[in-house]
Amino acid sequence: MATFNPGASSSAADVLSATTATATFLVPTTAAVSHPGAHTAHLQLDQFGGFSAATATPLQHHHHQQTNSSYTFVQIKREPCQVSEISSNNCHQQQQQHHQHHQHQVQHQGLSSASMTASSKTMSSSTLTTLVKIEAPSPKVSELEKSTGNSVPIGIAVARKRPQEALVPAINTPATLPLQPPLNKDLNCFGIRVADLGATSCGNLYFTGNGDLMTTGTATAEELALSAAGVNRAPSTFWQYPNALPIESVISMSPATVGLQYSREASRGQVVLLPAGPTALDPFQQAAAAAAFVWPSAYIPQAPAPGGHSAAAAAAAASLQPTPNLSSLPNFIFPSMGGHQALSTTPSYASTLQLYLAAAATATGSSTMCQHSNQQTSTTTTNSTINLSLAAGSGVTQSGNAASSLSSSSSLSASSSRFLSLATGQTGIPSLLSLPPPTGLKEEYPMPLALPPLVPLEAARDKEQALNLMRLPTPPTSATMEPSSLGHATPHHLFQSGAMATPTPALLNLSMHGNGGELPAATPLPAVSDEAALNYKLHAPLTPQTPPRLADIPVSGSTQLLPQMQDVNIQTDTPVCSEDESFPGSAKPQDPAAEAFPPPTHVQPLELTKPSEASHTQPTECHTQTEPSDIPSASQEESAEQTPPEPIETMTQATQADQTSPEDLTGLELLSNISTNSKPLVRVKQEPVEHIEQPAPQPQPVNIMPSEPTLPMPPMLEMEPTSEREPLGGLKLLCALAEQRIQEEVVQGSSLFATPSSRTPTPTSLALGTTAATPPIFEAKSCYAFGQSQGSVFPSSTSSFQMPLSSPGFPSMQGIELPTTSAGIVAELTPVKRKKHKHSKSSGSDSRKSARCSKKSKKKRHHSSSRQQFSAPAEEDLDLQDDQLQSELRNALHAVDPSYAQRFGQEVFSIMDNSMRMRLAKITRQYRKKKRKLDEISKHKKKKKCSKQQLELQQQQASQQAVQPSSALQQPQMTLSSVLGTSSPLRDYKFPKFSSSNLQASSFLRFPDKTHSFPPPPSLQQSQPEPNPLPSSSSPSTSSFVRLEPSALDAAVAIAPTTSSTSTSGSPSTKQVASARKQRKMKASTVGAAGEQTAATEAKRRFSAIDRELQLTSEHLYRDETRVLTDMGGLFYAGVMKPLRPPDVYSITLDGERGNKSHVMSREDILKDTILEVAPKSVESVPVGTRLCAYWSQQYRCLYPGRAIDSEQVVDGTASSATNAATTAPDFVSVEFDDGDSGRIRLQNIRMLLSDYPIAEYNDNPLYSVGKQKRSALRGGESGPGGVTQDHLTVPGCEDSHSHHSLGMSSDNTTSLAATMELFTQRSEKKRLKKSLKKMSKAQNGVSPATATNGGADAAALGDGVSAEDAARKHHKHKKRKKHKKHHRKNGSEEQEQQVVQQDYSAAGQEATEAPSTEMSSATSSRVKVEVKVKTEQLEMEEEESASNLMSEISDEAKGDDLVEHNNSKGSSKIAAFLPERQLWGWYGTAYRKAGVKGRARKQFYKTIKRGKETITVGDSAVFLSTGRPDRPYIGRIESMWETTTGNKVVRVAWFYHPEETTGCPKLKFPGALFESPHEDENDVQTISHRCEVLQFGSYFEKFGADSKQYQSIYDNNDTYYLAGHYNPRLQVLKLQDDIPTLEELQDTNTTTTTTETTTED
């Protein structure tokens, strides 16, 4: 296909990304050329897993040098439902394969580098054209058999059985497989022969979920390259199942599963090759293995030492192969690859899992750096981690290291992060100590320099991917197993720049989560090989200058002991020490050797590894291996507290530091930028003081920081690392403080979190660095935090932590959160303070600020600043201004430059004794107490000043502490921080979810929860700087989300300063954030300075969980997509918000909008008009009165705002408040919309609204606005106690200002001044009070009335920073402003004149209103003024009105009728204009709705109308106005009355007909007869003239008697009629009642009587 040199600009990532239908993989044909000298000393891991002698055949080395730059593109064709098969036509491949086998044999003999070299030769010698075909048909049995040659069938685990399975029994023993040369024939699960790939072992072959196959590792890559020309390839054995299958099901359970098993990852459906080891992997391990993806180390130049390339490749391949028997555990996926079982103990197969499922594998090939952008289809690409796997050939130990690296890589894959695997030959264990090999590696590591560009790209995606990977089921990030025999394996180191002197390959495992899946244990074996599998948290260490992590791990005889420590992910043949158990014995022996071995260069790279990967190593490191890279990894894994171990690499590090310091810084910076949050947890306990090697040799305080995932401290250190001062300078003090804090945290944090990791933040600067990454990691000991140098302590805490980290899903990612770059450590420190502020804000940040401002707080701040520098806590509260502390810290930082950092960290940790830790904790407690007091006393202005000063101080201190190189790092970090800050999508975007949970599990939670003192903010900062959102959500301080209410962003920020601070990594962004926070705080505290904090706290408590869920936070602003509701014209539209140019410009694509046109909005608009889309989970979650919006119909895209109401049922014409709608329909909620409509809405069509969202007025006709307002007011008022209106204060159980109004009115109270005022207030509101209300609403209504709506929620919102303008605006929108005034007056002092019930309600309302108003005296005073004004205006109105009308109206209103409102609404009635005002009818009584009526047409019905003293009720008869017919008025029976949505009062009338209007009616004796008819009409209520009576004839006759004179004037002054019968005007059918007398009957009767009398007389 195509080969290119790493030097070429083209990158593998580009190539990979470019592929679509066919995926092209760049397979490095050879390792980078390296100086043969470098290779000679290193022991190398045979690709088969065997350990080979450090020396490699010269030819191999030479070949390596030649072929180091060539890459092979492998094209994979994808066909539906088929798995890729890679075929290549290369005679070269066969030769290579044979050569590889030969080399493997040689390696068996002790030349591990030979195989590596051979593979690299093959790769380089020929361009491999590999086509991967996906074929539906399964390979024939015969072909398979031929291809496998009785080798372990790799595809046996596939869902569909293949003939290969028959071969399985033959290869039951892992030993058999590795030993068999036929393994060359072995087919991949993918049907790709390792030989085809040109690699003897599959260690370098990576299969991406996309069906892409990649080879990695120098020699391995070469072997994989396609050396199998002579091998018969069988058709692809892939299964054809398109659907994803759980990995566990795929994994073979057979005891003798030497081959790799083909499995699909359930989540992504990607194909994963899992090594089938003699020991079955735990399901979680298998899952981890499946998830793990290691970037081919071949991409990284790997020829530092003779055989170094092969060692590196082998290490990379074997990194997943913990046991020396790499052959049993195929170097990579293909067990056959590992041919020498005899040489190595059977490694766990989990480690063989080098295939990383990645939807897309993007590789950037550069001479020194390979970046694999593992973009998983299912997981967001945003979380990309760079896995640097430096495999150093160093005998057996290298194998262990390789396994460690591989495990790290698998962990990385879990994070779906990019991994750079640097395969570098390492000298044998003795060589480890020697600097020269490391130097060779340095040359070979130009890659770190290349990394910087990659970092930016990766930075954004790493976190997310890492998080996604973290989700993988396996607690151990990597399935790799580390054999105990690997104990001697050199610790993996992160190489940030080619400068790394240590030859040991370092695998940067970004994705390693707390489980410490990497084989840091192997890392501690630096003596054997410096290859350190470090889980580097790209996010946390932005500054390359923190290489100190690469603490040198002296290679002691005990290096081999390192295997004891094992990662959760690592299965070791030898008993694995429990997580809590430290490997002091093994670690200790290693310490000296490891310490000597790691070069400063490694230390710097280790900074990159700042995440916990070193932790795994660190347990080993515990014996002072403190390899810089190991330590950082361990620090992340263990607790990222092993920074001190970094100093361990004294002589070697010191030497290397000079060489690699600059390069490492660059690499670190790049890695930091990449900052993938991967925080492996080390399960091995390390003894705290074991790796006593003083970090002094290394001046890399920054490295220490990196080792400590907690960023806050690392940035500080990074700034200073350049200067090399006494190793312990101020570090001892800081460490002591940090340790003390850790102890304190452990106690508190353990209670907060199940895991002891809560201590994490407190460790020394190392701890600080680790805290962010390892807060969850720190678990076992408070002292361990300082002791990354003390490997054992960390391991124990790490192991405890490991569980928490992995348990959160991949909380290790949290460690990654620590991603805040070391360069940005200073900046992040500031964010930490901010977080602190946020925390304090949730618990009193304002007072905290004041405290900080105060001298006391300054002193405390000084302590905390020292902590910040040396411990993750980096308390914001601490004032760094203290001159002594600053000078001490500066000295310490300068003393600890990259080379000294590790030693420094170790020394500090060692120095840190329990007493110091206790002292630190004491100081912290005192500081917190004082700070709280100060907070209470402090005022808003003071708080502002304090916050500004604090920010400035922090920045100044950070700058002072930071050395110029650090500052250089800091600039990118600042940029990153700005990105990561409120505007930083990387951190906010990636870690909001995982991070929060992880942090909660960590000590972060404890800090914020218990106090806002320095420890919590620093820990948050460190862990959150990159994944800021995570810490926010995870820790209590985070718990106060940076929910931004509409146009209340300031308030939200003020509420959750922690989040903001977390997001801001850089000092510049910190300043901006600080100023913003100040402004927000100002707004929030406008009402009152002294009581502001209390008020805010109360408001927060009142703030419903719904409001918090709905508010946008800074984290949401950086997510790729966020479901939101945006307010447009009073209606809400659901859509997806995406950042265009965060943090300023965003786009919202509304659902169902034509063409998916996006609306571009500014940050301000987003925060003001947008809320998160939250659907209620159940009807119970929508209590009556809840503000919500709902889809009226599926056909409409908009959601109408409204509120939940009680479902009402009409019973006998009366409205009764029925049980909540939930009782009748579980999934329906009765909703009253702001436009007056109501209905029962299905739960799925409802979305939550902020409780203080104002009632929008929908006035189709402005002329009806008055009536509309009244109508809504009436509706709300008459809804009864059960009803809830937004405008009144919250009453327990129901909030309805109108409810008390209607209740009060219902009583027969005498007219009172209050009633009069209410009446006139209502009438004059639009006129004179309108302006005054607008002016005063800000002060009064904004607080009190608006608050009434939420029952204090508004007040809380105001206290939280809702602007007065917003409150005023909201209040102005309320339809029931009149009621508001009335309500306020009632609350004032006139309640006594109201009914008892009313008093109760108003009293409750008053309490609700005055609770906030008492907190804000200004609001109270303003309200009083408004009331006074209202009274004055009412008096004026009184003069305008006639006394009679006024009194009648007042009396009516006192009785409870809302006539006044209806009089005001006369404009809504057409006839009203022709009637005197006092003759207008108004509703009387409570409105009701008929059950069963749905939709907008649902009306508010009333039983009664009233005018003055007259009342007419449904069922009554009335005379209607008519012209020209005084003798025959229109008379009808009132059937029903209601108010329309436009405010009109309508009456339905069943008309009566006069006899004159009928046809065929006989002459009736008595006038006043009426006939019922089916004729009904709807008329305006105002057409009713007056009430009349329509009686049965008997009653009528009894009333008037037989006197005919009475009947003559009946039409003149009598409104009594009788019902004579029924008439149908349409049919003209009349039915006369039987008892109705007619004139005809009378005549007949008279005649009969006369005749009778005459007869009698006769």
From Swiss-Prot:
Domain BAH: 1510-1634
Pfam families: BAH, BAHCC1-like_Tudor, SH3_TNRC18
Compositionally biased spans, kind Polar residues: 612-637, 650-662, 1411-1423
Primary site of residence: nucleus
Ranges of Basic residues composition bias in the record: 832-841, 850-865, 1325-1337, 1369-1386
Low complexity biased stretches: 106-122, 948-973, 1020-1040, 1057-1070, 1346-1361
Compartments reported by the entry: Nucleus; Chromosome
Ranges where the record places region Disordered: 85-122, 575-662, 829-878, 927-976, 1007-1042, 1057-1096, 1270-1308, 1323-1425
Keywords associated with the record: Chromosome, Developmental protein, Differentiation, Nucleus, Phosphoprotein
Modified residues (Phosphothreonine): 546
Database matches in PROSITE patterns: BAH
GO BP term (any one): positive regulation of heterochromatin formation
An annotated GO cellular component: chromatin
Function: Functions in the determination of disk-specific identity, downstream of Hox genes. Overexpression induces ectopic wings with antero-posterior and dorso-ventral axes in the eye field. Overexpression is sufficient for ectopic expression of vg in eye disks.
Domains (record comment): The BAH domain is required for localization to specific sites on polytene chromosomes.
Protein name: Protein winged eye
Species per Swiss-Prot/TrEMBL record: Drosophila melanogaster (Fruit fly)
Gene name in the database record: wge
